[in-house]
Structures are given as C-alpha cells and as structure tokens.
Amino acid sequence: ISPVHKYIKDYADAGANIITIHPEATDNLKDSINHIRSFKKKVGVSLNPDTEINTIENLLNEIDLVLVMSVFPGFGGQKFMPEIVTKIKNLKKIKEEKKLNFDIEVDGGINFENNKIVIEAGANILVSGTTIFKENNGNIKKNIDSLKLE
C-alpha cells in the first residue's frame, strides 16, 4: 500500500508487533521508521528482488527486520529466484561486519529444496505459504517442521 505513512497507526492500533514497509511505498523511509517507532513497534523493511541493499544500508542500525522478497509481490505459488541468495549473503555480511542486530526474513517460493540454502546464506525467518499448505497432503505441522534445519 502506498503511501504507507497514513496506514501505520491503523496497523499499530490493530495490535501489530512488527510493521514492515517497502522503501518504494514512502517518500521518506527515515520518517516512516520513526513513525513506526513512535507507536513502540518493531520496524521491518522489505526489499523487492530488484531493490538494492544500498537503498536501506544507512538505516540498518534502525531496523529490526529486513524482509528479502525472493519473488515479486502479488500472488502465491511463484518460483524462488535463486539470485536472491547473493542478496541474503550480502545482508548477513553487512550485519556481521557492522555488528548490527536485525532479523533476515525471506519470503517467496520457499520450499524443501531451497530452505537450507536460504538459511545457510543468513536467513533466520522463512515465509512459506504454498509448501506449508499443499505438500504432504496439507500436513501443516510436518511441513513446518521439515522447513526447519533443527
């Protein structure tokens, strides 16, 4: 949704713990981050496949979560874009080099074939819809457990 600024209060009032926004959905990302913080909420910033890390790099110390989209937003069931693994690795490298503390979440086409690669690249949160609800005859618990590397 855009512009995102006018909806932040609605999400905060509805009880959201983390409010994640796209840089493209705001005229001033820093102001939107501060607006989210004014409601005592965690801040997430989402990077589309074609959004570069440098778009948010100077604000990473103010972000709780970076959501790396491994498909273009719009509909479920899309194929994972393997070139996104490099972006995840680069985010992890920046996080470690600058000693920052943010989660790396990946959403889009996550399945049993790519979950390990994504986690090893640096993701600690995976979003998976189609795999969770459709694999193994819809056995949600089994599918979630299978996506974990524990």
Predicted regions and their residues:
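Acidic, Mg2+-coordinating phosphoryl-transfer loop and its flanking beta/alpha structural elements
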Residues: N124-S128, I132-K134
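Conserved anion-binding
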Residues: K6-Y7, A16-D103
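Hydrophobic residues in well-ordered beta-strands that form the structural core
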Residues: V45, V106, V127-S128
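Catalytic cores of alpha/beta
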Residues: H5-D13, T51-I63, G108-L126
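Short Gly/Pro-enriched loop/turn and capping motifs at secondary-structure junctions
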Residues: F72-G74, G109-E113, I132-F133
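C-terminal helical cap(s) of enzyme catalytic domains, especially alpha/beta-barrels
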Residues: I36, I119, F133-E150
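Conserved strand-to-helix beginnings and helix N-cap segments that scaffold or border functional pockets
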Residues: I8, K30, M81, K116, ...
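N-terminal glycine-rich "phosphate-gripper" loop used for MgATP/nucleotide binding
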Residues: I1
